[in-house]
């Protein structure tokens, strides 16, 4: 709805007033002022006068008014030029006022043909030109743009020729104007055309021969090299002039030229060349706008203020932003190429410069100026504003150009094309004349550029975020795979440990069984030995030995009991290890379940990624649909413009009667101004509220994420600076427009006075004008009603946008609060997680230490078992030796008893025998026999004693136990033989030998007691160690329970952490979406305020 503006009404009324005044002067043949040189044509080819400059907006040509016109014309021209005309009329309508004009007048007005000529520097060969002609002639859209451009070019060239032709004054003035024309250097206006010939006539009455003669004259024209500097500098980019009236769609297309051309040229050339092309195009835009503003007020007293206003309107910041955005579009080449592919295919465009040719030959122009001096005096107030509007329209007609299409050069042949294009050209000129000039449209250009680049940035950020999410999901999938492999390796290691422990347990059980069997056998042997010892006779030595053996047996029994306890403890440890193995199996099962859950989560994430890709496709389709909608709206806008042109043609028939229409229009203008002020105040209030809310939200967000908000603060600062600049520009423009309105009101009052004077002298010829005034009033009423409905709809939309903004602010506040809460929870969960990890690592270290201790205990147990077996073997050997010694001692004891009994018997027998001998000897009286017998008996006794001693010694050394019997017999014989002293000595020696044996046995007993004490000490140490190990083993189940609890807590915390992390990620994504939405809403509000 950018074509709707309240100032249209005032400009339309003022233009209608000027046209009515002109037509009334013409009809009544009133000559109050001297004719000016606005519409007089200079002959082409006159010596000393250079031809007009081709294309562009020539400031010196605009300024010819001051040099060639009469002294009375400049104030009128300045008044006409400075007026902010939105839609002006240039062409003289031949359907109504031709009845009041003479044929010569009509002929002079109608002859203003314009012929295009190719430039002197072409950048494409003729073969490429022909191919591009064939390509560009096919699509219908290119024909629509071509016809629009042809119409614009006709209006521009026709009016420029009308302005640039001075009156036939003396030759010195002609030379001055010619010198001024030759010094003009302007950028060439370039048009899109798919035909080789652009030959346009503004009316249908000109014959074919006159058109061909004009084309023949224009063939000799050539452009100077300096006049094509901008064309050579930027051959592929049109120089779009700043049109104040161009709608939001058209300005969007103008700026899209820069973005799309920058992207396409980057794909074919370097980015540096692309940025230089964009800058040159922006420079052309700025210079063209300055030319337009400077040409619009050549004689205005406040020219410096007006230039400052234009500089503020099209500030360098806006152009630098556009340039930066075009450079940024290189990074997002894929996205912008998609957009350019959506918009550009099927359109064959070409660029042709316009050469402004003189309107008529010299003779015809001289005759027309002589006959129609009065008519041209009325025209001089209208020509300059019409030129201004036509230049605006020609700038507005710049549309996106496909850089891949070659530049098509127009050739000045085929005169029939001029007749075919002359009808649409006149209609387009009329449409262009009514195009308004609105300098604030420059701000719309900047706004649309920012909007488009924000769109591109959003698409780029969406693509980047999706690619990042995809990369994160792939990393998560790889991590899950690694965890699966790790879990499998742990399960395999646990299974190997299980097998190893089962083998160890089986070996320990076998050892325990063997020890139990040996213990039972030892008990049975002890019982048998006790029974045997109980049955036998008791002696002091055997009792001591038995006590010692019993003590040894008791010690060994105690050791066996301790070993059995240790074995029981080991069996308990084995059971606990089996339980631990079961727990490990449960952990493995849990890990497998967790791996399955992670696989399911990975599948879910893949599904989410697929859904996001589908959403991206939907976004692309929506973008294409929006592009098609934009094109459709552009077509609708063109259709509406055609309708407006038709309405304006109808309204031209009522141009003479403006008294009542002017009163109504002034009232409407005041009402619209009041409404505009109210709307601006409401917009300012909304913006203030939005700024306050945004400042609060920014303060909260700065506490959360200062880095993100710093960028937003910088953007808001830039926007505020731009807003201040725009406000300053608007204030300057408002002052300028107020001053201009005051001047226009003065002119209108003068015109009203003049019209009142004329209305009294108007004849019956003005009656049809009154009827047309009534028709104009009716059409004005319908237009006002339609504009009121439009205002209502706009106000409704404004209210809806305010409600949406409030809801969005609330959503952002809630999202920020949720994000804060989630961050606090995440920090607490992370701290708990770190503590649990530390505790888990500590418990794992304790578990490893306990495992090492358990291994050491097992090794010591095996070593002690080996020592116990050795002790058992020694015990068995000692038992066997003690049995043998016992048997020997018992046999010796019996032998000694028998010997003692024999000795008693022998001693008794010997005593009886000695008594009998004594009696016999006393009875026998022969002393010699007695001496002989005594000597013999002494000899025999000595021999017997010696033999007895020798035999006794030999028996002691050889046979041992048998010595007693031999000695006993010898003793008996010696006693019987009468050797008692020798026998006593022999017994003493045997007693000494027995005492030596006893001492030796006592030494052995003491050694055994020492070894027993050492073994008992070792047993005490082992029992203490075993008790300590038992206490540690008792602590193992507690540690296991604690480890299980910690594992459960760790798993639950991990699950909670995963859930919180997912929630935080979702909230982060929601917050990003809300921020993006707020950015878009802020940008929309700023655009509304700028508009």
UniProtKB/Swiss-Prot annotation:
Ranges annotated as biased composition (Basic and acidic residues): 217-234
Region span, Interaction with Elongin BC complex: 329-338
Modified residues (Phosphoserine): 73, 78, 112, 136, 213, 324, 326, 329, 334, 340, 357, 411, 540, 923, 926, 931
GO biological process, one term: negative regulation of gene expression
Modification after translation, per record: Phosphorylated by FER.
GO cellular component term, pick one: Golgi membrane
Bias kind Polar residues: ranges: 57-81
Keywords: Coiled coil, Cytoplasm, DNA-binding, Golgi apparatus, Membrane, Nucleus, Phosphoprotein, Repressor, Transcription, Transcription regulation
Acidic residues composition-biased segments: 368-379
Region annotation (Disordered) ranges: 42-86, 100-280, 360-443
Coiled coil: 443-767, 824-894, 984-1090
Subunit-structure text: Component of the SNF/SWI transcription factor complexes. Interacts with RAB6A. Interacts with TCEB1. Interacts with STAT3 and FER. Interacts with TRNP1; may regulate TRNP1 proteasomal degradation.
Domain notes: The Elongin BC complex binding domain is also known as BC-box with the consensus [APST]-L-x(3)-C-x(3)-[AILV].
Protein name, per record: TATA element modulatory factor
Source organism of the structure: Mus musculus (Mouse)
Gene name of the encoded protein: Tmf1
């Amino acid at each position: 709805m950018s074509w709707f503006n309240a100032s249209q009404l005032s400009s339309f009324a003022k233009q209608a007033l000027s046209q009515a005044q002109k037509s009334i002067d013409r009809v009544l043949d009133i000559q109050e002022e001297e004719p000016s040189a606005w519409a007089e044509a200079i002959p082409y080819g006159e010596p000393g006068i250079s031809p007009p400059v081709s294309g562009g907006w020539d400031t010196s040509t605009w300024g010819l008014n001051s040099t060639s016109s009469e002294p009375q014309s400049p104030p009128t021209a300045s008044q006409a030029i400075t007026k902010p005309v939105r839609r002006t009329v240039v062409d003289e309508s031949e359907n109504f006022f031709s009845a009041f004009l003479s044929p010569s007048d009509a002929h002079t007005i109608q002859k203003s043909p314009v012929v295009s000529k190719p430039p002197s520097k072409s950048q494409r060969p003729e073969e490429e030109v022909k191919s591009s002609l064939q390509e560009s002639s096919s699509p219908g859209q290119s024909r629509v743009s071509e016809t629009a451009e042809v119409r614009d070019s006709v209006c521009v060239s026709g009016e420029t020729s009308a302005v640039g032709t001075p009156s036939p004054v003396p030759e010195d003035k002609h030379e001055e104007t010619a010198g001024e024309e030759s010094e003009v250097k302007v950028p060439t206006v370039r048009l899109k055309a798919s035909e080789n010939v652009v030959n346009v006539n503004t009316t249908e009455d000109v014959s074919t021969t006159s058109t061909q003669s004009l084309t023949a004259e224009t063939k000799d024209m050539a452009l100077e090299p300096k006049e094509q500097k901008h064309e050579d500098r930027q051959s592929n980019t049109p120089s779009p002039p700043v049109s104040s009236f161009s709608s939001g769609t058209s300005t969007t297309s103008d700026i899209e030229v820069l973005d799309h051309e920058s992207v396409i040229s980057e794909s074919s050339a370097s980015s540096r060349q692309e940025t230089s092309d964009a800058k040159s195009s922006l420079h052309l835009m700025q210079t063209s706008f300055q030319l337009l503003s400077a040409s619009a007020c050549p004689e205005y007293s406040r020219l410096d203020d007006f230039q400052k206003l234009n500089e503020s309107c099209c500030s360098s910041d806006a152009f630098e932003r556009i340039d930066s955005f075009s450079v940024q579009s290189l990074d997002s080449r894929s996205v912008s190429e998609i957009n350019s592919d959506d918009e550009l295919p099927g359109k064959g465009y070409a660029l042709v410069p316009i050469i402004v040719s003189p309107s008529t030959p010299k003779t015809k122009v001289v005759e027309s100026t002589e006959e129609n001096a009065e008519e041209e005096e009325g025209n001089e107030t209208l020509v300059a504003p019409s030129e201004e509007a036509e230049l605006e329209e020609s700038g507005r007609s710049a549309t996106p150009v496909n850089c891949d299409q070659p530049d098509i050069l127009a050739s000045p042949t085929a005169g029939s094309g001029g007749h075919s294009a002359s009808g649409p050209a006149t209609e387009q000129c009329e449409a262009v004349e009514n195009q308004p000039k609105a300098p604030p449209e420059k701000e719309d250009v900047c706004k649309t550029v920012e909007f488009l680049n924000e769109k591109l940035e959003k698409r780029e950020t969406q693509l980047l975020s999706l690619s990042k999410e995809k990369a994160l999901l792939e990393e998560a999938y790889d991590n899950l795979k690694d965890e699966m492999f790790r879990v499998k390796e742990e399960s395999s290691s646990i299974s190997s440990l299980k097998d190893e422990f089962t083998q160890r347990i089986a070996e320990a059980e076998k050892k325990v069984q063997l020890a139990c069997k040996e213990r039972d056998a030892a008990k049975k042997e002890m019982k048998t030995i006790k029974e045997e010892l109980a049955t036998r006779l008791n002696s002091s030595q055997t009792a001591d030995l038995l006590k010692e053996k019993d003590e040894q047996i008791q010690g060994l029994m105690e050791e066996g009991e301790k070993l059995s306890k240790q074995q029981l403890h080991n069996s308990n440890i084995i059971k606990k290890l089996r339980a631990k193995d079961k727990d490990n199996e449960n952990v493995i099962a849990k890990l497998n379940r967790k791996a399955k859950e992670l696989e399911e989560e990975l599948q879910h994430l893949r599904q989410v990624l697929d859904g996001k890709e589908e959403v991206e496709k939907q976004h692309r389709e929506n973008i294409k649909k929006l592009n098609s909608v934009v094109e459709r709206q552009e077509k609708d806008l063109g259709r509406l413009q055609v309708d407006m042109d038709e309405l304006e043609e109808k309204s031209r028939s009522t141009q003479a009667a403006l008294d009542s229409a002017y009163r109504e229009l002034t009232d409407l203008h005041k009402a619209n101004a009041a409404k505009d002020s109210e709307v601006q105040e409401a917009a300012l209030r909304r913006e203030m509220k939005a700024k306050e809310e945004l400042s609060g939200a920014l303060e909260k967000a700065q506490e959360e994420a200062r880095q993100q908000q710093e960028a937003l603060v910088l953007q808001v600062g830039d926007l505020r600076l731009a807003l201040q600049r725009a406000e300053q520009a608007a204030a300057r423009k408002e002052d300028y427009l107020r001053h201009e309105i005051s001047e226009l009101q003065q002119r209108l009052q003068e015109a009203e006075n003049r019209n009142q004077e004329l209305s009294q002298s108007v004849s019956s010829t003005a009656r049809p004008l009154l009827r047309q005034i009534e028709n104009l009033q009716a059409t004005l009423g319908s237009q006002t009603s339609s504009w009121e409905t439009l205002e209502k709809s706009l106000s409704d939309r404004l209210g809806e946008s305010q409600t949406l903004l409030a809801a969005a602010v609330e959503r952002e506040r809630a999202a920020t609060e949720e994000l804060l809460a989630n961050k606090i929870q995440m920090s607490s969960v992370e701290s708990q997680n770190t503590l649990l990890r530390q505790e888990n690592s500590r418990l794992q270290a304790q578990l490893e230490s306990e495992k090492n201790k358990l291994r050491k205990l097992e090794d010591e147990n095996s070593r002690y078992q080996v020592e116990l077996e050795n002790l058992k073997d020694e015990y068995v050997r000692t038992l066997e030796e003690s049995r043998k010694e016992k048997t020997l001692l018992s046999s010796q004891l019996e032998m000694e008893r028998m010997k003692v009994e024999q000795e008693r018997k022998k001693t008794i027998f010997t005593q009886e025998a000695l008594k009998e001998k004594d009696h016999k000897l006393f009875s026998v009286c022969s002393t010699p026999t007695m001496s002989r017998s005594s000597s013999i008996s002494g000899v025999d006794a000595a021999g017997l004693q010696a033999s007895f001693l020798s035999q006794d010694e030999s028996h002691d050394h050889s046979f041992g136990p048998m010595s007693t019997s031999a000695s006993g017999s010898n003793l008996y014989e010696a006693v019987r033989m009468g050797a008692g002293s020798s026998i006593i000595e022999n017994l003493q020696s045997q007693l000494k030998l027995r005492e030596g044996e006893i001492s030796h046995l006592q030494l052995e007993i003491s050694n055994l007691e020492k070894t027993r004490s050492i073994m008992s000490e070792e047993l005490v140490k082992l029992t203490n160690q075993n008790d300590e190990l038992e206490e540690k083993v008792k602590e193992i189940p507690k540690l296991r329970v604690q480890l299980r609890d910690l594992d459960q807590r760790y798993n639950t915390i991990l699950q909670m952490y995963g859930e919180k992390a997912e929630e935080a990620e979702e909230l982060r994504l929601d917050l990003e979406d809300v921020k993006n939405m707020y950015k878009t809403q802020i940008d929309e509000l700023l655009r509304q305020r700028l508009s």
